[in-house]
Amino acid sequence: LCANDTNAFPHSMFKWRSHSGDDVTAYFTRVSYQGEYDVGRVFECRNGNKQSSIADISFGMFGYGDGGSGSTTDMLERAEALKNIPGVPETVNSSAHEFFDEIGKKADEFPVYDGELYFENHRGTFTSQAFVKKNNRRGEFALRNAEILSSAAELMGKCDYDGAELERLWKILLVNQFHDILPGSSIHEVYENAREDYAELNRGLEKLINEKLNVLFSERDPEAFTVVNYLNVPYTGEVKIKLPEGYNSVEYADEQIPCAKLSDKTGDYISFVAEKIPSLSGRTYRFSKSEHPTQPCVKAEKNLLENNILRVEFDNNGEITSVFDKKNDREVLAAVGNTLCIYQDKPIHESAWNLEFDYRMTPYPLKTAESVEV
């Protein structure tokens, strides 16, 4: 927070209130987490305490960090020498635990900061090396799913829990959550290694999940399939599945499910809405040879998408030229939409870390499309 580019953080000692409503005693030091042990730093640390009227004590760290070697003999000797210089604030080498124990005595008097501790800098790290963010989040979900399936298989007496393999895969994921890998601010070679790690992670998770699904659903009916809900809440949402040859629809409890039969380059598949599948459970559906119930369908052409609610028109570059609301009989698009743009990205410093406030002022619309497909 000391590197905010617009607003100075207002407190040193405070209670941070999270979105859950819980309070945590916090301290924002005005000096960096690494540096020298000298007179200037001692005064900077002392004078930076904005709550000195509540607790007249400050906290600072010294040494070479971020891959350095910590404190040096010279720093420790200087710390002893500063104790004998008149006018220099009294210092003592201690620990963060002892510091927080001391200021905790006055914590009820601290101001409360309610909400996100937003860092006004390094906004580019939300998008840099996007494949890392994508694989990280997918890996977190898949690891949880693998743990659920492994636990279920063990509880049902079908196989042992794969603790060792899950630990190995978790460690691959966690290594790549290091604070420079995940934001996208590492050097190029790091991301070559990260791609290899994620490939190994994805292979391992796919193998483990498929093994557990095969164990749990070993007595499968070739005319049936099970939709599994890994969430801890009931799930309602779209399900897409390939249709075996000769089948046209899906049924549950001997009732036809409204669905849409679609096709792509890989063959025919069915799309339907699975409603209220219980948490951490599943529901088995059956393929049916009956024709699927008629559903209001989307009309899709080269320059048109239309259903019973909206009519959306596109030009030959893929830009939206019209959105017509059929229910209210009115046009709702004021100007051309879906314009694809690239923007000039020349941050003042740390190019992988930052986006400047004014980047939106330099758009370059991509007006000519080689091909457009709806």
Positions of the model-derived regions?
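Zinc-dependent metallopeptidase catalytic helix centered on the HExxH motif
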Residues: 1-5
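Active-site and substrate-binding clefts of carbohydrate-active enzymes
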Residues: 11-220, 230
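Catalytic and substrate-binding regions of extracellular carbohydrate-active enzymes
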Residues: 163-167, 175-374
